[in-house]
């Protein structure tokens, strides 16, 4: 179950879902201890980007947990959090600097038999860190996500297209998806159309198979008059069409098919760039 766009998950929301085997809660910042109570069949878990004080999910009952992904902005994990997860044999950490953990955060079976995957260039740091050094097998992540720009800016109410790639490209067939950590500042579609909503800064995440890479988005006040094209909409042969809410309304659209759209303002996106048009 992918809940990567959900920030707050209510009490007992999924309590007793004994058939739930995969869970991804990348954006969650408020999870009660009761939210996933009784979900003891979970085998794969993608933790939130940041393990904050409001993340109170009880993990001791997830005895079938085999694969764990740790969020990139995690500073610490409480001791004995995974001590009862005796089947946990794959741990993926997105954190370059090892989070603070205790010597019993994980169980002895995990320390002895699991593989710990860490970001490129971080193996030695994990081998020297308290708790992490108990892992007998520490390797680099099988791939990394490379974002085209670490920091971008967009005017409020306007949109830009961001991109990222996986290297090595052959390591996964899954697409890179995008998520905003604060939709009040900027929203993003999963394929990277970012729309400014209010002035400020926000982190958006490129995500693929539990691995993440951040991008900083600065939303600026738009002071000028918006230039909306009303003549020749595009020089491109095909493009995806989005409305101003960032929702994709047409894929592989040709110039001739634009006339089929309802009247309004749209964003035309292709690998070569983007244009805003009025229909």
Segments from the language model and where they lie:
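Consensus positions within tandem repeat domains that build extended binding/scaffold surfaces
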Residues: 10-13, 33-35, 57-59, 79-81, ...
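Short, surface-exposed beta-strand/beta-hairpin micro-motifs centered on an aromatic residue
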Residues: 1, 192-196, 256-258
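C-terminal outer-membrane/trafficking sorting elements
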Residues: 175-176, 184, 205-208, 216-279
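Membrane-proximal C-terminal cap and juxtamembrane stalk of leucine-rich repeat ectodomains
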Residues: 106-142
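Hydrophobic loop/turn residues within beta-sheet-rich immunoglobulin-like superfamily modules
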Residues: 6, 197-199, 253, 260-261
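Extracytoplasmic soluble-region selector
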Residues: 142-222
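Structural signature of tandem-repeat unit edges
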Residues: 1-8, 18-30, 40-53, 57, ...
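Core beta-strand segments of extracellular beta-sandwich domains
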Residues: 36, 105-106, 161-166
């Amino acid at each position: 179950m992918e809940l990567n766009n959900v920030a707050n998950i209510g009490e007992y929301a999924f309590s007793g879902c004994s058939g739930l085997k995969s869970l991804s809660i990348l954006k969650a910042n408020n999870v009660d201890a009761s939210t996933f109570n009784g979900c003891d069949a979970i085998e794969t878990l993608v933790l939130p980007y940041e393990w904050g004080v409001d993340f109170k999910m009880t993990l001791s009952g997830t005895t079938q947990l085999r694969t764990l992904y740790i969020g990139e902005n995690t500073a610490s994990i409480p001791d004995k959090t995974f001590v009862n997860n005796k089947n946990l044999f794959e741990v993926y950490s997105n954190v370059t600097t090892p989070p603070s953990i205790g010597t019993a955060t994980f169980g002895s079976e995990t320390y002895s038999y699991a593989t710990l995957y860490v970001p490129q260039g971080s193996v030695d740091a994990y081998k020297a860190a308290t708790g992490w050094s108990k892992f007998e097998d520490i390797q680099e992540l099988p791939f990394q996500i490379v974002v085209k720009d670490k920091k971008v800016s967009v005017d409020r109410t306007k949109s830009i297209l961001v991109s990222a790639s996986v290297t090595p490209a052959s390591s996964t067939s899954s697409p890179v998806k995008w998520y905003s950590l604060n939709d009040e500042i900027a929203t993003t579609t999963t394929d990277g159309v970012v729309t400014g909503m209010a002035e400020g800064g926000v982190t958006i995440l490129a995500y693929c198979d539990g691995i993440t890479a951040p991008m900083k988005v600065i939303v600026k006040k738009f002071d000028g008059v918006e230039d909306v094209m009303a003549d020749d909409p595009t020089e491109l042969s095909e493009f995806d069409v989005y409305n101003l809410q960032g929702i994709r309304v047409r894929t592989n659209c040709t110039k001739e098919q634009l006339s089929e759209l309802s009247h309004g303002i749209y964003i035309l996106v292709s690998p070569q760039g983007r244009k805003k048009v009025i229909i």
